[in-house]
Amino acid sequence: MSRAGNRGNTQARWLGIGLLGLFLLPMYLSLEVSVGKATTIYAINGSAILLPCTFSSCYGFENLYFRWSYNNSETSRILIDGIVKNDKSDPKVRVKDDDRITLEGSTKEKMNNISILLSDLEFSDTGRYTCFVRNPKEKDLNNSATIFLQVVDKLEEVDNTVTLIILAVVGGVIGLLVCILLLKKLITFILKKTREKKKECLVSSSGNDNTENGLPGSKAEEKPPTKV
């Protein structure tokens, strides 16, 4: 009885975990926010940089709220926030903290883009930028993504020497393998032709020997007709 009871409790526990997972899974898959693959981007002092952000929702959205915030070790503030009424409306800004910020997003063609352009960069702009989205249609479900901006005096040139060496080595190895395969095919072809010639020579030599020895099947076997 105790084993049966334990088995029943285990099954009930796993069933409960499975049901909880099915309940929570749509929440994790519905509203997504992305700032691209790069976690850190670099920009030159005095230039402009586009901070990308897109969102997606499996259930659609209405009066979706979004905001960009900035923080570093010393300060934290909201840069811009706004509302996207629906998928046929462009994002509308409610509050903007800095005139250097421009909303570059659009929801047309299902892009769901709420990226911002930050102009006239300063070294103090270095920090973490977070794109936050909340969807009332999904019971105020929210999500966010963060990207780090590093403002530099100049962009460092990437040394591609190692990459070029690796590519050269790989290319050389591939070229060598191709040459080996071609050489192998050539040798195989030559050997095949050599065997065929040897075989022809042996057959021809055998025929000549038969003729000279008067063996059956040779011309020496033929006898002149008997005169009557």
From Swiss-Prot:
PTM statement from Swiss-Prot or TrEMBL: Contains an interchain disulfide bond with SCN2A.
Cellular component terms (Gene Ontology): intercalated disc; plasma membrane; voltage-gated sodium channel complex
Example GO molecular function: voltage-gated sodium channel activity
Cytoplasmic compartment spans: 183-228
UniProt record similarity statement: Belongs to the sodium channel auxiliary subunit SCN4B (TC 8.A.17) family.
Residues in the signal sequence: 1-30
Gene: Scn4b
Transmembrane segments: 162-182
Subunit structure: A voltage-gated sodium (Nav) channel consists of an ion-conducting pore-forming alpha subunit functional on its own that is regulated by one or more beta subunits. The beta subunit SCN4B is disulfide-linked to the pore-forming alpha subunit. Interacts with SCN1A; regulatory subunit of SCN1A/Nav1.1. Interacts with SCN2A; regulatory subunit of SCN2A/Nav1.2.
Annotated tissue distribution: Expressed at a high level in dorsal root ganglia, at a lower level in brain, spinal cord, skeletal muscle and heart.
Predominant location: membrane
Keyword terms: Cell membrane, Disulfide bond, Glycoprotein, Immunoglobulin domain, Ion transport, Membrane, Signal, Sodium, Sodium transport, Transmembrane, Transmembrane helix, Transport
Job of this protein: Regulatory subunit of multiple voltage-gated sodium (Nav) channels directly mediating the depolarization of excitable membranes. Navs, also called VGSCs (voltage-gated sodium channels) or VDSCs (voltage-dependent sodium channels), operate by switching between closed and open conformations depending on the voltage difference across the membrane. In the open conformation they allow Na(+) ions to selectively pass through the pore, along their electrochemical gradient.
Protein name: Sodium channel regulatory subunit beta-4
An annotated GO BP: establishment of localization in cell
Originating organism: Rattus norvegicus
Pfam families found in the cross-reference section: V-set
SMART domains (UniProt xref): IG (SM00409)
Annotated glycan sites: 45, 71, 113, 142
PROSITE patterns assigned: IG_LIKE (PS50835)
Keyword Transmembrane: yes
Polar residues bias (residue ranges): 203-213
